[in-house]
Amino acid sequence: MLPLVCRTHEKPVAVSMKKMLLLVASVLLAVAVTAGCATLDAKQREWIFQPSNQSWGGAQSTSDMQDVWMDFDSQETGQSARLHGLWLAQPRADAPVLLYLHGARWNVSGSSARIRRMHALGFSVLAIDYRGFGQSSAGLPSEAMATEDAHAAWRWLAQQQPQAPRYIFGHSLGGAIAVNLASEVDDERGTMVEGTFTSMADLVGSFQWGWLPVSGLITQRFESVRKVARIGSPLLVVHGSNDSLVNARLGRQLYEAAQQPKRFVLVEGGSHHNTNAVGSPLYREAVASLFQLR
């Protein structure tokens, strides 16, 4: 039987995510054989992004954040698109600004606590929902669409804050989107990623059932390790030592593939979801020294 080659249009609990990835790995072959590449691609996009309008927090968690909207014409879908974002500004007009890119499953308001911690470091923060999440345009997200969404938000920041230095932050899956964006723009002052990975194939392969032969069937590849060397700004890679979803080894490998200046911070006791909180003092010191922000 000839190998199946799939081509795409493209260019929060850890346990449930692991179950999802196990489902991806165990079902990919069956879906590919019985339903073909289009269904395989769609199922992967559902499993990886888990798009939702659900959040960990309620309206109160974002009550002091401003709703903002970004409209653009999507080259990926050929349709008009609208992104919803949350804007948390600093009192200082010249404060650095940060584009916050969240991970899978929950909408942007589920990241409100992490948004506030980044704000406490001195950034004005724009956090967006990709299409398919929250109040952004409906649709099934993909790697290409999420990258396009990140670019749209980056342009919005440039238009709204033309004098401010701009930075990129991504958590988990958002870290892969952040690396992709940073590798394609040349006006970022720095990039931060937390709890992220080298590639989707490496992530699937890092689990105990990673021997399953599914790498060639992955359409949403998120190959950050191939892109990170193209980032021309300082890179901060943060990982929790107790991250049971994305092994810290993958974060270290991503860091090693990047150019200088860069820094790797391992937060002892940090999990996939609390590293940002547990490691707040380390974040503050690393941001100050690597990006020379006070």
Predicted regions and their residues:
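An N-terminal hydrophobic leader/cap segment in hydrolases
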Residues: 32-74
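Membrane-embedded segments
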Residues: 77-156
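Short alpha-helix in the alpha/beta-hydrolase fold that links the catalytic acid
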Residues: 114, 224, 233, 247-256
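Alpha/beta-hydrolase fold nucleophile elbow
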Residues: 161-172
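Hydrolase active-site cap/lid region
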Residues: 175-233, 277, 281
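Short beta-strand/loop motif that positions the catalytic acidic residue
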Residues: 231-232, 237-239, 243
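Acidic catalytic loop of the alpha/beta-hydrolase fold
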Residues: 242-246, 273-274
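Catalytic histidine neighborhood in serine/cysteine hydrolases
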Residues: 255-274
